[in-house]
Amino acid sequence: MSTLNELIHYCNEYNPIGALLLTGEWGCGKTYLIEKDLTRALEKTHVIVKVSLFGITDANALRSLIRQKWFEVCTPILGQLHKAKEKSSGFLAAFNAALHAVNPLAGSAANVMVSMNMMDVLPIKAEVEDPKTLEKKRVVLVYDDLERVKMDPVQLLGVINDFCENQNFNTILVSESDAVLRHLMKEDATTYHMLREKTISQSLRYIPDFAEILHSILQERIWPSDDYAEYLSEHKALILDVFASDYDQRAKMLLAVEDGKYHNLRALTKGMESFFRIYYHTKEAGVALPDSHLYSFLAYYLAAKSGIRKGGELVLEFTESDLTQFYPGFSQDALTNIEREWIKTGIWDTNLFLEEIGVRSEAGQTDKNN
């Protein structure tokens, strides 16, 4: 069964025994899988509420955030508050506006209720009704950015377990690996294993189909020009080779390699967007753009922005011999020095680029900031 089908199967459990832990390499598309594929597959039966754990420091803050995100997503489904929310700033102002619209004399009551913070008073439920179809929809809580949480791990798992086991929310916890949880609980392994067993009922390793994901990115994203979009599509196989030539074997064997490259889709997408500058200036200058240039640019960009793995650790410092090891098609001669500088520091000079590729332009003909 595919990862997506496993997620769908779990979300259809009416009274989940525990949360599902979805793991996968940093940047490999776990969030894309949830926000695009799973949301699309469950749009008629479920509502996805995403909760970022970034910077959360205590249980009260987490509970408040869960409720806030629930209201932000589920309020439009519950009814007329949706229109008021569109005209107001924030949920509390929306509630006040909606109540006053129903009964102008209720303004003072609305103010009292707002002062109580309605998100802490009104109940949230694991099932809501779609006002258009009157069909029930399950609410799925998705916790992301586990690596960046700052709260006590015992409290973290306790809150997650409360919403899952006691309030019956289907719950997905997204993390790079189970090792993150073990690291959070490193000072008390016994407590960790007890809470993990109680909180997480299923672990699922995401093995992405990068060919399909790349196809979607190329088709759905708005690129700087139609001809550049066509250029990228024509070089889809090369881009996939740069990005994930080593992935299939690793994924099938579930290898945790000590040395290698990261498969970060955000960095790849930004790298393809950035390469438009190279594509544009070479085209304007009438200079041929060999495939090795695209390959080498993306390899250098990926290593600089998402790092490489050395000794099992993420490092951003690398040599070009590292690149030839992890990206066999990388050519030092294909990449200009100004491109290296631009990728690393953001400093760009069109004149220097044109000089490096053999084009002499008249002074003032090009703009350094272009």
List each language-model region with its residue ranges:
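Extended alpha-helical coiled-coil/bundle linker/stalk regions that scaffold oligomerization
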Residues: 171, 276-370
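Short regulatory helix/loop adjacent to the ATP-binding pocket of P-loop NTPases
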Residues: 180-200
